């Protein structure tokens, strides 16, 4: 009997609905879908028993759900409203500006101004549960009960794990629903069920469970109370021991037949009769066993029977409690490390971030899928502005639910992290994996329009088009990047990318050469352009490309590069003619030209020694350039790959998992 109860507990500790005289256990087929439904409010109070919104309510919900833009009404807004509004309109990430705006509209008690402010605020910060409460209270103060109810529903859709918001909403229902309406209790019970489904597995959800138990006690529904305890005693929570103590009081203070369903009561009596060897008049076995204990006429036996049943009920739940206590002990240290379980724009301490990472790893390794998802949901409230946790969440969901992955990415990118590139790029990559090429294309395009100038995003768009055979579009994207570049360096960077695309992918050497030559005309001091042009020419028929290669060398040697770089290119020109040249005269001329450059360098050195040294700033820049470029040129140019760091176009100091730090790796030494 003990083992069967324990197995039942492990499989269904959180499944009882508590809505009937018997314990009904339901198992969602896919908790990924279940929690997704909760966060989308498909499991909203709207679906509670006997809660049917009228057409008027639906229209009001739509009106409240959208930002209010009533031009005529805005003329009558409070005098300082426009000042506060402009601050957040110009910078929606100014959280302090939002706080001042919301405080102002609350003080002014201007409903339309408040609606506009709150509606816009929640587009950016839906996890601020306290402001949902303020908004709902504001509507209620104006006797707008239906809009107030709708605000609560929207808040619970945005943050379904908020125990506080659920409690506030249930209290709101208790205050506003008609106690004389026979459907009121069903509505409240249905809301309690949605609350514990969404937030009941939170380690700090004890107040919600206590509230549910107390309410059922007030209604005199002792069997419902027992059903709730059957669930909470199997969930690791902060006050797990307190719940067990209250459960024992519940059992001791009430008769077993009032605590259990008829089926449970009969099963328990049979078990006790079997253990005690009862037969005949003491306890008719089999189907003839009565549902009550009225057949026991001896008061002493009656008391003994009741106490035995109470003892057995507690014994069964003691085993559940012991198992749960073990689960709590494994998580206690992690839970103590969570100092800020709610959302805030201020950065979290490193210790708390580390604690979240370790807690998630522990739960992934040891917990059920349901517990992992709930912990992730808790984590992305506290760490909503840290894309690493959203990415980790999405990666975890890949093995459980494709729609779940999409749901996580969508929430992260469209609400909490609209300007973080990595999570958008991973979302696009995920959609591409699923064959949703247009969706991947739109994600990258939309993000690039939101955050301009990120090379990593433009290159991802190019590679997406290339992978799917849209070579002209890939070329167009690079040409557009060159055209709209903010500097010569940026333009040259994209020119190299375009040239290599044309040469390696489209096999169009003349067009590739033209791109680099035009780039050199714009940016004559950029060593990387010459290197890439040479590498490209070296990749073809050297005899056929001899003139083009020599022209490239001449551009570098006679151009505006530092003397040290010009000498290096000159030396490589001599080596090229020595190894592959067809005209000895060109070789001799190149040698003479090289000697002239060496003399020029000696002359500059003597001037520097005599006090005519070039400005320190320019010298530092020159040495920087020549040092890095010389390293690239040393060795076989055919193997050389031009290094080009474009971290200047990466904002936010992102570490790039695709190692975009260089154009091409340098040759092995």
UniProtKB/Swiss-Prot annotation:
Domain of life: Eukaryota
Region called Disordered, residue ranges: 1-23, 599-634
GO cellular component, one term: commitment complex
Transmembrane segments: none
Primary localisation category: nucleus
Low complexity: compositionally biased ranges: 11-23
Residue spans of biased composition, Basic and acidic residues class: 1-10, 599-624
InterPro entries xref list: HAT, TPR-like_helical_dom_sf
Phosphoserine: modified positions: 44
Biased composition range(s): Polar residues: 625-634
Keyword terms: mRNA processing, mRNA splicing, Nucleus, Phosphoprotein, Repeat
Entries under SMART domains matching the protein: HAT
GO BP annotations listed: mRNA 5'-splice site recognition
Compartments where located: Nucleus
Leader sequence residues: none
HAT repeat start-end pairs: 109-141, 143-175, 183-218, 220-253, 333-365, 367-399, 404-436
PANTHER family referenced in this protein's UniProt entry, alphabetically: PRE-MRNA PROCESSING PROTEIN PRP39-RELATED, PRE-MRNA-PROCESSING FACTOR 39
Protein family (similarity comment): Belongs to the PRP39 family.
Stated role: Involved in pre-mRNA splicing.
Name the UniProt record assigns to this protein: Pre-mRNA-processing factor 39
Top-level taxonomy: Eukaryota, Metazoa, Chordata, Craniata, Vertebrata
